[in-house]
Swiss-Prot record:
Zn(2+) binds at D74, H93, H95, H167. It holds the Pfam family Aldolase_II. The gene is ulaF. One of its GO terms (biological process) is pentose catabolic process. PANTHER family: FUCULOSE PHOSPHATE ALDOLASE, L-RIBULOSE-5-PHOSPHATE 4-EPIMERASE ULAF. It comes from Salmonella paratyphi A (strain AKU_12601). Its EC number is 5.1.3.4. This is L-ribulose-5-phosphate 4-epimerase UlaF.
Amino acid sequence: MQKLKQQVFDANMDLPRYGLVTFTWGNVSAIDRERGLVVIKPSGVAYETMKVDDMVVVDMDGKVVEGRYRPSSDTATHLALYQRYPSLGGVVHTHSTHATAWAQAGMAIPALGTTHADYFFGDIPCTRALSEEEVQGEYELNTGKVIIETLGEVEPLHTPGIVVYQHGPFAWGKDAHDAVHNAVVMEEVARMAWIARGINPGLNPIDDYLMNKHFMRKHGPNAYYGQK
C-alpha cells in the first residue's frame, strides 16, 4: 500500500499547489480494488505538516485498517462513489471558490466553450438539496447517494465531477492524479462560465456539434489528441 499512499499524499499536496483549498478544506482518495482498500487524507491535518505515513487506509465499510489518524470526514461519500462506479480510481473534494459558488447558487456549471468540452460532456450538474432527514442521518453517505442519483446512468468518466447543492465540488478520475486534474479543470471552467455570463448574460451553451468534436477527439474511441 505504500505506493498508493505516496500517490494519494502527492495528490493531496497538489490541492494547495493549484489553489483549490484553504486551510484543510479538501481531501483526495484512491482505491486498490484488488485488496478492497481505500487510502484517504486524514481529517483536519494541515497540509504544511502532513506526511506520507499520515495517510489513512480504510476498508470498503470505512473501518480503519492502517493509520494513526481518523480518516477524512467525507470518507463515506468517497466509498459510495467507489462502490457504485467500478471505473473510478480516485476521488477529490474541495471548496474551490468558483465551483463552490455555483454549488451555493444551486446551479449547474454550463458548458459554454471548448475548454469545458475537452473534459466534461455537457453541463457539470448540481445535485438537489439534501433533506433535513438526510443531513441529520448518515450525512456523508447521503451526499454520495445524491451524487449517484444526480448522475443517473451517465458514464462518470464522461462527467468527471459534480457540484453538491450548497456544499461544493466533487471530482473523480482513473486515479488520484487524474481526479485532481479534473478538479482543477472544474474550477477553471466554473470561473470562465461566471466571467462569460457576466459579459453576456444571454449567452447560449456551446453547440452540440462543437462539444461532441472536442470531447470525442480527446476521449472517444478514435481519439487523436496528444501522443500515443
